[in-house]
């Protein structure tokens, strides 16, 4: 899920109704107990929390973190793969997201009626597609008749391979065994896989989860690629906000890999192959590039040997190179303006350092001050008092936060008001940050909400698994989850003013605007005036 979810809405995957009773009341009990646990941990120290956590790096390089939480007989997991759209090859954008889809298609033992025959058929599919692509993409001397013949041969090969497929077998096994919240997400920085199961299905989970990252099969690849193409059409090409965000991001990042859309460019979606996806998997889905977190009714002494038995089978490889292109300093404002039949919108973003910056907590504090709830500065000024916007906020982490990224502000215009008014009002609030100290009450509220948000985020097994996993992956230490609250607690009024003056400058700003287009003029009817 992208960090600009407030603009786009969450990415959801529809799932069939489960076939066994859900564990809603147990999960509720888990949440209640978790609040007590985390509150106590925050009030005391990390040591009390450490008693429940076991951390181990397997011989193949996989980092495993287990948190014992026995309040309900369920567990959740979070598999973090340190590869997102930033790692997409230049001419194959969208490949990280595409493989996420393929990870649900099964393995060499799940999802096939006859895998040896299917494997041979899939090889023929790739051969036919490569021949079709070579002719289709010739810069000169293309033979249109030959292209049609090769396309037909490729599609016939796909049909032949599809006869061996058992659709959705991987997900149905999980659901039949009580799986909940089965999903995955790809963003610019990483790819995540997660769901929950009853505790007595732990070994089944270990087999399933390790198998899909050991023996994935690129079955139904081109069918699923069409699903992704349609997803792009719906979320970007046919969506004014999606179009703005894509063009805004490419304007703000001209060198950094953040200028590539996670969904991928349409020409790349229409070109990359199952072989490309398999190559991406082989390079990035390796134990040293992954963190596995399990939280729930499991005992580390029993669970870790099971994890080693199954996940330890995955071959070890050297961690891939993480170097990316650094965005050079911006020296003048950039603007993107779209004319759309849509509600007018004003968006602006300012370059800021990555999440390892000493000022990361200060940026979080500014985001809280400007945007958290109906008492936030932007909501009060633009929505409540001036009544010029239907919504207004600021947030950090656009489009990701692992590398240098943007701190953004936005406002949706009320009828009769224009984006320029939003810009003026937002800049007035930014200028206050630069020239005036925030109040004692505001500073206290920033720090109080940071602690409350931590407690809230860890209330469920899945939430805790995510937070522990992402911090272990990013900092090589899950304890950073709690240290971030300590860093926010040390923010001063002077820090807010200093960072605001350093970051929120006109030359460092990229602006994105949606202006409401005039409706098409009525065409006079024949014979009329």
Predicted segments — roles?
Residues 1-20, 25-29, 33:
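A cross-taxon signal for low-complexity, glycine/charged-rich
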Residues 32-42:
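C-terminal segment of classical bacterial N-terminal signal peptides
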Residues 40-65, 291, 299-338, 351, ...:
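Proteolytic maturation boundary segments
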Residues 67, 72-85, 94-96, 111-211, ...:
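M16 family metallopeptidases and their MPP-like homologs
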Residues 93-105:
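Active-site recognition of the HExxH zinc-binding catalytic motif
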Residues 102-107, 201, 212-220, 232, ...:
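A generic secondary-structure signal for well-formed alpha-helical elements
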Residues 218, 225-226, 233, 241, ...:
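Non-catalytic, conformational "gating/processing" segments within enzyme and secreted inhibitor domains
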Residues 233-235, 249-250, 319-377:
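His/Glu-based metal-binding/catalytic segments typifying zinc-dependent metallopeptidases
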């Amino acid at each position: 899920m992208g960090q600009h979810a407030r603009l786009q809405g969450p990415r959801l995957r529809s799932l069939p109704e489960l076939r066994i009773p859900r564990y809603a009341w147990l999960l509720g009990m888990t949440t209640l107990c978790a609040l007590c646990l985390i509150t106590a941990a925050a009030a005391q120290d990390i040591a009390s929390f450490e008693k429940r956590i076991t951390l181990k790096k397997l011989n193949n390089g996989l980092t495993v973190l287990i948190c014992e939480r026995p309040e309900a007989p369920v567990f959740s997991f979070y598999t973090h793969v340190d590869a997102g759209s930033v790692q997409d090859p230049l001419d194959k954008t969208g490949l990280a997201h595409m493989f996420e889809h393929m990870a649900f298609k099964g393995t060499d033992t799940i999802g096939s009626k006859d895998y040896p025959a299917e494997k041979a058929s899939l090889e023929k599919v790739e051969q036919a597609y490569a021949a079709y692509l070579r002719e289709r993409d010739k810069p000169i001397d293309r033979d249109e008749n030959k292209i049609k013949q090769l396309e037909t041969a490729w599609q016939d090969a796909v049909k032949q391979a599809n006869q061996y497929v058992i659709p959705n077998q991987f997900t149905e096994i999980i659901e039949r065994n009580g799986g909940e919240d089965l999903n995955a997400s790809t963003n610019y920085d990483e790819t995540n896989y997660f769901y929950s199961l009853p505790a007595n299905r732990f070994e089944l989970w270990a087999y399933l989860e390790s198998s899909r990252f050991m023996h994935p099969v690129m079955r139904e690849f081109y069918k699923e690629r069409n699903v992704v193409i349609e997803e792009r059409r719906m979320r970007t090409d046919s969506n004014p906000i999606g179009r703005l965000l894509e063009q805004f991001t490419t304007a703000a990042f001209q060198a950094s890999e953040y200028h590539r859309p996670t969904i991928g460019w349409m020409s790349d979606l229409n070109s990359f192959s199952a072989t490309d996806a398999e190559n991406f998997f082989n390079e990035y889905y390796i134990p040293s590039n992954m963190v596995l977190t399990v939280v729930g009714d499991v005992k580390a002494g029993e669970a870790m040997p099971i994890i080693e038995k199954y996940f330890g089978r995955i071959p070890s490889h050297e961690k891939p190179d993480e170097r990316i292109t650094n965005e050079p300093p911006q020296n003048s404002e950039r603007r993107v303006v779209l004319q759309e039949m849509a509600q007018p919108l004003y968006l602006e973003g300012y370059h800021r350092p990555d999440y390892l910056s000493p000022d990361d907590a200060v940026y979080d504090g500014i985001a809280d001050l400007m945007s958290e709830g109906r008492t936030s500065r932007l909501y009060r000024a633009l929505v409540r008092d001036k009544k010029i916007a239907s919504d207004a906020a600021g947030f950090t982490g656009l489009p990701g936060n692992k590398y240098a990224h943007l701190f953004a502000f936005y406002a949706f215009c009320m009828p009769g008001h224009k984006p320029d008014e939003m810009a003026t009002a937002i800049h007035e609030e930014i200028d206050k940050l630069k020239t005036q100290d925030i109040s004692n009450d505001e500073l206290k509220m920033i720090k109080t909400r940071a602690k409350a948000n931590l407690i809230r985020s860890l209330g469920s097994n899945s939430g805790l698994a995510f937070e522990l996993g992402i911090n272990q992956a990013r900092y090589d230490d899950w304890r950073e989850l709690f240290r971030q609250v300590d860093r926010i607690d040390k923010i001063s009024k002077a820090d807010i003013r200093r960072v605001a003056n350093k970051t929120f400058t006109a030359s460092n700003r990229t602006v994105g605007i949606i202006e409401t287009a005039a409706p098409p003029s009525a065409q006079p009817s024949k014979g009329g005036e």
